[in-house]
Amino acid sequence: MGLREKIKAQRERRKRSIRIKIEGSSERPRLTVHKSLKYVSAQIIDDSKGITLASASSQEKDLKSGKNVDIAKEIGKVLATRAKEKNISEVVFDRNGYIYHGKIKSLADGAREAGLKF
């Protein structure tokens, strides 16, 4: 097993253990984050119905330019405003196996600044 596969396997293990403890409901949906080397995206998901309630991504036209950490913070703010439009004020944060640092932390801080509670 190469280094890349080992890191991916470790993240998948963390992701599984987190998902056992976290489940989104209609009252408190799950805010999940996905990042690649180039993009960051986040979704608010109602696990009981299996639907996405709101989403934001760095691939959107108005969020494309800037540094990754700054863009992640803007994504958090945009996602929080879209959630407020759908009367969602509280969520459960799912870091999806990623370390709570850098882009992930910045996205969470941006969502908190815009009024989302978790």
Swiss-Prot record:
Please indicate if the UniProt record lists Ribosomal protein as a keyword. yes
| Cellular compartments per GO CC | cytoplasm; ribonucleoprotein complex; ribosome
Xref: PANTHER family: 39S RIBOSOMAL PROTEIN L18, MITOCHONDRIAL (PTHR12899), LARGE RIBOSOMAL SUBUNIT PROTEIN UL18M (PTHR12899:SF3)
State the Gene Ontology terms under molecular function. 5S rRNA binding; structural constituent of ribosome
Family per similarity comment? Belongs to the universal ribosomal protein uL18 family.
**Claim: Cytoplasm is one of the keywords in the record:** no
The protein's name in its UniProt record: Large ribosomal subunit protein uL18
GO:BP terms for this protein?
translation
Please give the start and end residues of each transmembrane region. Answer: none
InterPro entries named in the record:
Ribosomal_uL18_bac-type, Ribosomal_uL18_bac/euk
Q: Which UniProt keywords apply?
A: Ribonucleoprotein, Ribosomal protein, RNA-binding, rRNA-binding
Q: How does it assemble?
A: Part of the 50S ribosomal subunit; part of the 5S rRNA/L5/L18/L25 subcomplex. Contacts the 5S and 23S rRNAs.
Function, in words: This is one of the proteins that bind and probably mediate the attachment of the 5S RNA into the large ribosomal subunit, where it forms part of the central protuberance.
